[in-house]
């Protein structure tokens, strides 16, 4: 066997601008075809009952594809609701002109956040009696009723009302 040196050092000084020559899109890129989103939603929607709601989840800026753009095509395809992860995402989408119901999938724990949610015509996800009581107090204070989504923990033990106690808590 030959005796080789294993720790050779490459002289990068000979190539001072080699990083600038690398195209970041060289190996990975994405092209969003709105018509494909619309067609996919329409196909999925066709498999559902006419009375069934269809929510397009567009969190993380439409999974990096522009939430407004993805939302527009999903709505054209028949999405009746949209879902986002955070209050800020919901506000941004609503202020972009989207009129459909928008559900905030993440929890809103404070009265302030819930008021902001309702003022922006967004629907919060509620997963505790405490949050229900806050919503009830806000509704009484403003003399209004607000739509909301109740999250029930059906086994993942993450968020939501405990399944076994859910009915008891609302009697």
Language model: regions and residue ranges:
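Conserved PLP-enzyme active-site core in the AAT-like
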Residues: 47
